[in-house]
């Protein structure tokens, strides 16, 4: 499913991401935009470590989920990576909350560091009926 921006914002808010671990809803929407363009079905294979990034937040199979093919995977979220590709983003949000609790916080996402960190991320939810 490809979410519209405000639709994604509403879902993320409903699932408790606004203010989670000190990050605003705008941070999460900005990150999802630059990671997957709000596409829950997005996958990207990383040749270097043979891992794959999954879903709206592009969560990686080396650390966070099990896809049965990533060498030395940790599965810290305790889920199948396929759960992260569903139209319903509940599992992706639960796992993203686990990711952000790590010391790196949202720095775990290259897109957040590059496009959202230190920026006015409120623009990502402007005009959305939340």
UniProtKB/Swiss-Prot annotation:
Segments forming a coiled coil: none
Record note on pH: Optimum pH is 6.0.
Subunit text: Monomer.
Superkingdom in the source lineage: Eukaryota
SUPFAM superfamilies xrefs: Lysozyme-like (SSF53955)
An example Gene Ontology biological process: killing of cells of another organism
Catalysed reaction, written as an equation: Hydrolysis of (1->4)-beta-linkages between N-acetylmuramic acid and N-acetyl-D-glucosamine residues in a peptidoglycan and between N-acetyl-D-glucosamine residues in chitodextrins
The protein's name in its UniProt record: Lysozyme C
EC number annotated for this UniProt entry: 3.2.1.17
InterPro entries assigned to the protein according to its UniProt record, in alphabetical order: Glyco_hydro_22 (IPR001916), Glyco_hydro_22_CS (IPR019799), Glyco_hydro_22_lys (IPR000974), Lysozyme-like_dom_sf (IPR023346)
Note: Lysozyme C is capable of both hydrolysis and transglycosylation; it also shows a slight esterase activity. It acts rapidly on both peptide-substituted and unsubstituted peptidoglycan, and slowly on chitin oligosaccharides.
Biophysicochemical property: temperature dependence: Optimum temperature is 40 degrees Celsius. Retains the bulk of its activity after incubation for 1 hour at 90 degrees Celsius.
Gene: LYZ
Cysteine-cysteine disulfides: 6-128, 30-116, 65-81, 77-95
Subcellular localization, as worded in the UniProt entry: Secreted
Family recorded in the similarity comment: Belongs to the glycosyl hydrolase 22 family.
Protein purpose: Lysozymes have primarily a bacteriolytic function; those in tissues and body fluids are associated with the monocyte-macrophage system and enhance the activity of immunoagents. Has strong bacteriolytic activity against M.luteus and V.cholerae, weak bacteriolytic activity against P.aeruginosa and no activity against A.hydrophila.
Cellular component annotations (GO), alphabetically ordered: extracellular region
Domain C-type lysozyme, residue spans: 1-130
């Amino acid at each position: 499913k490809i979410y519209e921006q405000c639709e994604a914002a509403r879902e993320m808010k409903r699932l408790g991401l606004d203010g989670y671990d000190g990050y605003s809803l705008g941070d999460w929407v900005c990150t999802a935009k630059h990671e997957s363009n709000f596409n829950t079905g997005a996958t990207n294979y990383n040749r270097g470590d043979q891992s794959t990034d999954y879903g709206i937040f592009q969560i990686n199979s080396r650390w966070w989920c099990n896809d049965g093919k990533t060498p030395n995977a940790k599965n810290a979220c305790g889920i199948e990576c396929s759960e992260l590709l569903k139209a319903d983003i509940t599992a992706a949000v639960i796992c993203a909350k686990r990711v952000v609790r790590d010391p790196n916080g949202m720095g775990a996402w290259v897109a957040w560091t590059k496009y959202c960190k230190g920026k006015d991320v409120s623009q990502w939810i402007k005009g959305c009926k939340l």
